[in-house]
């Protein structure tokens, strides 16, 4: 009993002393979840990937150089490069202390998950990846506010970005262009979100061994959300909904909602078929998208929203059986070239509703979007906010102007439009404790700019470290 009394007294004394030793100028953390602006900033990833945390709380790796060199002694990536950070293991966050274009020497593949790449941390104009693709084959991954502009200089027949057979991946505010194959292809994934991305100018008559391409992407998955993206200047696959030849396990449902599609050439959105012995036709919500033909759109397809497929020799070669059409919930889409298609979306489909449609929206197993706009509202939101838009470069600015003004064309090489623009860096804001949060922001929200550990603490918003809250708050106006 005496020991219990002594221990209690000592505990009380320590608490009093600790309180007395707090310096009067040290800020006290506010009660969690009391700032509605910060709470709202943490809710901007929507749909299938809404609960993905990436590398939050993990080791911070700073990208301080723009080369892609290996150590001459070990052959391993040099510290300070993007590849070095990506190739680490464990939970990790990649931030940038410089801006500019990184000309890769080979593909950049994320093979180990629990990683967040925070392009919005780059001072100045931001980061661009060039020459080789970004490939994601891992789970629990967030990539945001990065440009991936492939080009044909490396003679690589590649997508700009591909995500396959992964769980829990978020692509947020990316700007992707100049691919030789598809620009962005994402299929076979579960709990996936691609949002606010600009996918533009895949190369049509380029170096691909199969000849003419110029494709937007192959999109699919299970609990996969594609919303508020811009597809512009692609000949076809705007997008191509995936099929059993590339994946048999993830057959939907998916949300294709609030996207803008501009200046398709030979085909707009299509596909989604499957085999009776495989995954079967895909389950797709095709809702409130905005389609606008452009100068390169063929007259025969200028009023086409979607071309659901009912045949696929590749599917039956792989799986056998017979081919079934997708089941599409098709409603609320705007076709600027046709009031009748806007009024009745099924008149903009190559197949009837009885063949490829459903009366009810797919909801089972699909994380709903918390904010859904009309097609016309989404048009303005996407053109204003999509892409690597914290600092829009000349490429995205031109693409958005093309959409607004009905200009532009399909291209064959990036040199037709000037190639990669120069991205300028700038001075970083003061971060005395080197925790990733500027002193000014920490002071504003009751943190201690001299405490290097409060970035990993969770005191502002439930479920998010303070550093994650800062990084989401930084871009809060771009959603």
Each PLM stretch: what is its role?
Residues 129-134, 154-162, 178-186, 207-221, ...:
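Extracellular beta-strand/beta-solenoid scaffold signature
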Residues 17-36:
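Bacterial Sec-dependent N-terminal signal peptides
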Residues 120-127, 146, 174, 450-454:
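Extracellular beta-strand-rich, repetitive "passenger/adhesive" scaffolds
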Residues 416-479:
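Extracellular calcium-associated, cysteine-rich motifs in secreted modular proteins
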Residues 40-94:
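Acidic Gly/Asp/Thr-rich repetitive segments characteristic of extracellular carbohydrate-active
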Residues 78-90, 102-116, 127-144, 150-167, ...:
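Extracellular beta-strand-rich solenoid/capping regions of secreted or surface-exposed proteins
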Residues 114, 119, 139-150, 165-178, ...:
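Right-handed parallel beta-helix
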């Amino acid at each position: 009993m005496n020991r219990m009394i002594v221990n209690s007294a000592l505990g009380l004394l320590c608490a009093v002393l600790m309180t007395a030793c707090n310096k009067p100028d040290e800020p006290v953390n506010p009660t969690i979840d009391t700032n509605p602006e910060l709470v709202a900033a943490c809710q901007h990833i929507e749909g299938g990937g809404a609960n993905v945390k990436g590398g939050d709380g993990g080791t911070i790796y700073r990208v301080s150089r723009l080369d892609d060199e290996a150590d001459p002694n070990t052959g391993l990536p040099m510290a300070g490069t993007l590849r070095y950070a990506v190739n680490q293991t464990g939970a990790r966050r990649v931030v940038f202390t410089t801006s500019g274009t990184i000309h890769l020497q080979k593909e950049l593949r994320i093979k180990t998950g629990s990683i967040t790449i925070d392009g919005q941390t780059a001072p100045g104009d931001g980061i661009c990846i060039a020459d080789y693709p970004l490939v994601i084959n891992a789970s629990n991954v967030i990539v945001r506010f990065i440009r991936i502009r492939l080009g044909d200089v490396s003679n690589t027949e590649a997508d700009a970005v591909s995500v396959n057979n992964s769980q829990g991946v978020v692509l947020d505010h990316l700007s992707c262009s100049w691919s030789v194959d598809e620009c962005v292809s994402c299929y076979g994934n579960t709990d996936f979100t691609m949002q606010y991305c600009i996918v533009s100018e895949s190369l049509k008559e380029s170096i691909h061994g199969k000849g003419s391409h110029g494709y937007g992407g192959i999109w699919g998955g299970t609990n996969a959300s594609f919303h508020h993206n811009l597809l512009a200047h692609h000949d076809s696959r705007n997008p191509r909904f995936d099929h059993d030849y590339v994946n048999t396990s993830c057959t939907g449902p998916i949300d294709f909602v609030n996207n803008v599609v501009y200046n398709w050439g030979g085909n707009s959105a299509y596909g989604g078929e499957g085999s009776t012995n495989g995954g079967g036709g895909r389950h797709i919500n095709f809702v409130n998208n905005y389609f606008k033909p452009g100068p390169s759109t063929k007259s025969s397809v200028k009023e086409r929203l979607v071309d659901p497929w009912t045949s696929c020799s590749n599917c039956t070669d792989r799986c056998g059986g017979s081919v079934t059409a997708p089941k599409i919930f098709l409603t609320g889409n705007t076709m600027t070239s046709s009031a009748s298609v806007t009024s009745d979306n099924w008149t903009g489909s190559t197949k009837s509703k009885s063949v490829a449609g459903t009366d009810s929206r797919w909801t089972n197993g699909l994380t709903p979007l918390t904010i859904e706009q009309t097609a016309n509202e989404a048009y303005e939101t996407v053109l204003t906010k999509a892409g690597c838009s914290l600092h829009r470069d000349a490429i995205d600015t031109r693409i958005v102007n093309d959409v607004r003004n009905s200009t532009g064309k399909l291209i064959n090489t990036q040199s037709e439009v000037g190639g990669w623009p120069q991205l300028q860096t700038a001075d970083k804001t003061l971060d005395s404790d080197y925790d990733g949060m500027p002193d000014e922001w920490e002071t504003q929200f009751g943190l201690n700019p001299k405490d290097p550990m409060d970035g990993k603490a969770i005191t502002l918003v439930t479920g998010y470290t303070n550093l994650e809250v800062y990084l989401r708050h930084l871009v809060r106006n771009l959603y």
